[in-house]
Amino acid sequence: WQHSGVRPDVVSFGKKTQTCGIYAGSRIDEVPDNVFKLSSRINSTWGGNLVDMVRCTQFIKIIERDNIADLVTKVGDYIVAGLRDIQKETEMYTSVRGKGSLIAFTMENPDQRANMLQSLFKEKVLALPCGKRSVRFRLPLVMTMEDASELLNRTRNASKSMAATV
């Protein structure tokens, strides 16, 4: 949301901090029995505990200390630009989009998406299906530019391999 110029009432987070939760602005107080006043309104699979909170706090400190948010932005922009170049070269997919580590592109149909996922897998790239026709990457926060270049090379190989069979 930081990129869109809006201030949300509630934000959920998870995955990268290995724990999940929400944080909220003052508007939540408009609900008399909100989740922060009446316990057990929101629960997670594991219920949360002190160890989870300490671990999450340490992850956040490391993310801030090592400027990981800036790294993720730079690497993500590099990957999106590279995927757009591959799109122009091979015409195998459309709608390259992304922000930070959330990056995807769209195939013409579900069968082509399945073929692309298989081609990427043969190149030792794990990608995920998304929606009906899209492919998305789940990138680590500590991905380097060198890692990103390797991802793009392997994606280019997978795209060219598919283009040769069409």
Residue ranges and their predicted role:
Residues 1-166:
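Conserved N-terminal phosphate-binding loop of PLP-dependent enzymes in the Aspartate aminotransferase
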